[in-house]
Amino acid sequence: MSDELSPEVFDAVCRQADQAARAQERLAQANTEAKNELLLAIADALDEHAADIEAANALDMLESKENGMDAGKLDRLLFDVPRVAAAAQGVRHVATLPDPVGEIVRGYNLPNGLRLTQTRVPMGVIGMIYEARPNVTVDVASLCLKSGNAALLRGGHAAERTNAATLGVIAPVLEAHGFESALVQSVDQYGRAGATAMMEARGHIDVLVPRGGAGLIQAVVRNSKVPVIETGAGNVHIYIDKSGDLAKAIPIIINAKTQRVGVCNAAEKLLVHKDVAAEFLPQIAAALAEANVVLQTDTTSYGIISGAAIEGLDLNHAAEEDWDTEYLALKMGIKVVSDLDAAIDHINTHSTGHTESIIAEDYAAIEEFTKRIDSAVVMVNASTRFTDGGVFGFGAELGISTQKMHARGPMGLREMTTTKWIGYGTGQVRA
């Protein structure tokens, strides 16, 4: 289908959103036990039909390989039986988490006796636009259902068969438990026009969350008429302070850069204090070369590393645009900085506000870094790969928000609710 939005597609997507809203009204009244039973049944169904989902995914993988998709994106696209099983286990974990709906955030009595309470309630219809991430379909469905929300999904062409197979498993479970299948729907049948319609559907969709590369995220932020929660691309930094334990730093960097290169919490830039650069850079360059990581370096780093005669090294001069680039590949930018202030200034200038890490033993340096870095997550002597809803104990995540309004960092169940105020009176009137 053409990317251009026709009135017919817009009307169809709005009808789907309205169906989702009506179904969500029923879900919002469901108790925690009913929602947990639903989630456990969905997890069992995913396990039962994992081979069918894998078969659909194999077709998506084959087409994407033929279309030249890079290795990082192919890794995200893969949804084989083990990954389906992991997703199902994530759904079970969501069922064990506290239900945020109905939680009293605060409450107090006014001098006139009026009792005020601020209570957590579902957002309503959450729209999700993402690309080549079939696990997100399961994650979003489970989080939305537990938090009392409906989900309207645009999962992208690359994963269209996989997502359809996954939703085909979830829909009958919803109906078997007395809920409408409209609670979790896809607009993939409309191609990119479906995403455009979602961005236009203000008044039908309550909030829109993009999850993908920087281009996708910025396109949604710029063009959406629906309120957006921005999940950020990850131009993620690790800073090696002069007080850092260099032996500790090497495995942290290798893990952060190479464990999964196509994810937003993978490290992209390495900043090294000048006092330890001569000692540390040849060591880390050798370790990165062994992992087939291409190095984009500033002049000082280049001079130090090039003199070390490291076998298999792919060493290059960094261009200015490198410092703002999320590679999502076996590539890393390296820069020597004069001091902690210079590292913080560089990060706050070039970061996307996702995750940064400091390797240091000096408490004052750690405190300065954690206070001044303007990102959603700051790690100390740990890999940036820990920025993840599952790792944080959320079971799954809607995304990792890099904005400051509503939610910041990994978005779990609580971040998928809003609040309402309820006033309990005994006849009070305002003078």
From Swiss-Prot:
CDD domains, per the entry: ALDH_F18-19_ProA-GPR
SUPFAM superfamilies: ALDH-like (SSF53720)
Cellular localisation: Cytoplasm
GO MF terms held by the record: glutamate-5-semialdehyde dehydrogenase activity; NADP binding
Metabolic or biological pathway, per its Swiss-Prot or TrEMBL entry: Amino-acid biosynthesis; L-proline biosynthesis; L-glutamate 5-semialdehyde from L-glutamate: step 2/2
Swiss-Prot/TrEMBL keywords: Amino-acid biosynthesis, Cytoplasm, NADP, Oxidoreductase, Proline biosynthesis
Entry's Gene Ontology cellular component terms: cytoplasm
Gene3D superfamilies for this protein: Aldehyde Dehydrogenase, Chain A, domain 1, Aldehyde Dehydrogenase, Chain A, domain 2
PROSITE patterns, sorted: PROA (PS01223)
GO biological process, alphabetically ordered: L-proline biosynthetic process
Keyword hit for NADP: yes
Catalytic activity as recorded in UniProt: L-glutamate 5-semialdehyde + phosphate + NADP(+) = L-glutamyl 5-phosphate + NADPH + H(+)
Top-level EC class as recorded in UniProt: oxidoreductase
Main location as per UniProt: cytoplasm
Top-level taxonomic group: Bacteria
PANTHER family in UniProt: DELTA-1-PYRROLINE-5-CARBOXYLATE SYNTHASE, GLUTAMATE SEMIALDEHYDE DEHYDROGENASE
Its biological purpose: Catalyzes the NADPH-dependent reduction of L-glutamate 5-phosphate into L-glutamate 5-semialdehyde and phosphate. The product spontaneously undergoes cyclization to form 1-pyrroline-5-carboxylate.
Record protein name field: Gamma-glutamyl phosphate reductase
